[in-house]
Structure formats: C-alpha cells, structure tokens
Amino acid sequence: YALWITPLRALAVEIQQATQRMNDALLPATKVALRTGDTSQNLRAKQKRDPSFGLVTTPESLHVLLSAKEHQTYFKQLRVVVIDEWHELLGTKRGVQVELALAYLRSFISKLRVWGISATLGNQELARTILLGATENYSVINAKISKNIRVKSVLPKTMERFPWRGHLGLHLLPQVLILIEKHKSTLVFTNTRAKCELWFHSLLE
C-alpha cells in the first residue's frame, strides 16, 4: 500500500491518472484512488471499506484520514509514503502537517519508507533532515538532465481593459492554449496556489 501526498488538488488529479495508467500496463489488477476535499462521501466510505493499492491525497485530507476512529487499521498495510513538491511544503504550516503525520505513522509502522520529490531544492541537506529526521539510512538521487528550455512571456495585445481583479490573466487563455498545443511539454507559471487551481480547471475545459 502506497500513499502519495501532493500540495495541490489539481496536481493530485494528474498524478492519480498518470499512476493509474502505469498500473494498468504493469499491474492491471491494482487501483490508485484519489482523496481530496472534492471526494464525495460515498466514495470516501468505499475507500475506507476497500483500500486501493495506492492513494493520492493532500496534507489536509491525510489528517482527516488520521483522525478517523479506525485509522490504524486503515494504514496497517502502508509501506511507502511519497511527498511530492517538497519544496512547496517545506517551512509552511502545511509542511508541518506533513511532518507531524509522518512522525505519527512511523510510531505504528516500523518499516515505513519515505520519499521526498522536488525539482527546485536549494538546501538538500536541510530538506532531507526535516523530512526524514536524524537518520543515516537514506539515499539521494539527483537527475542530471540537459534540456533546451525556451521561456516565453504571454502579454495582452492591449492594456486598456486589463482585469486586475477576479480571474486575473484568464483572458489570455486562447493564446496560452495555442502555445501548449504546439509543444510536447509546457510549463505554465502562476503566482499563487489559487491561480494554479483556476488555470488547471480552465485548461481542462
């Protein structure tokens, strides 16, 4: 049983779909579930009765699971926890939530393996210590990939009626879509978590 924790609901959806596709190819009988604030009560009850091979969730939803009466039974088969985008959580209240959850899980799961994933960590040693604690039993894997990166800023054709409030920037959606469709891999940067969620849903639609 594996648990994947991600800071964004939008990212959780993408990860669940990607891991399920991989499982369909390698382990067709296994399922990867999704648990966020948007998950219905019926689906939550089903997940509790019949846990999947893997669960993708957020720090807040993990704490909801840990507050359930029979949570130790639910997590007794847990072997691996993956913390995605650790740099986003590190040093924040939500990061502390993750640290507390991991400490508690370790108290009744003796051989729990924890993975931290990040593409932009400045101080790897500090990030590792906060995530794993004082242990010498760890490995660091660094990817050495050389890529040709092109950065393009998308600006409105006119600034006369620029919407500084509300759905800031969404009027540029058609231009951004053209760029995404032209390339195999595209990163869209937003300033806040809320904007990331907004753009994710808008691009899907």
Where are each of the predicted segments found?
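Conserved C-terminal RecA-like helicase domain
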Residues: 26-33, 193-205
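Loop/turn-to-beta-strand initiation segments
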Residues: 1, 31, 51-54, 60, ...
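Conserved nucleic-acid-binding Ia/Ib motif block in the N-terminal RecA-like helicase ATPase lobe
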Residues: 1-57, 61
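SF2 helicase catalytic motif II
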Residues: 60-63, 69-109, 113-114
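Alpha-helical scaffold elements adjacent to nucleotide-binding pockets in ATP/GTP-utilizing enzyme cores
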Residues: 14-22, 61, 65, 77, ...
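Residues immediately C-terminal
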Residues: 10-11, 61-64, 88-89, 123, ...
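Conserved catalytic network of the ASCE P-loop NTPase/AAA+ motor domain
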Residues: 24-28, 46-50, 71-76, 95, ...
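Conserved interdomain linker/interface between the two RecA-like ATPase lobes of SF2 helicase motors
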Residues: 103, 111-197
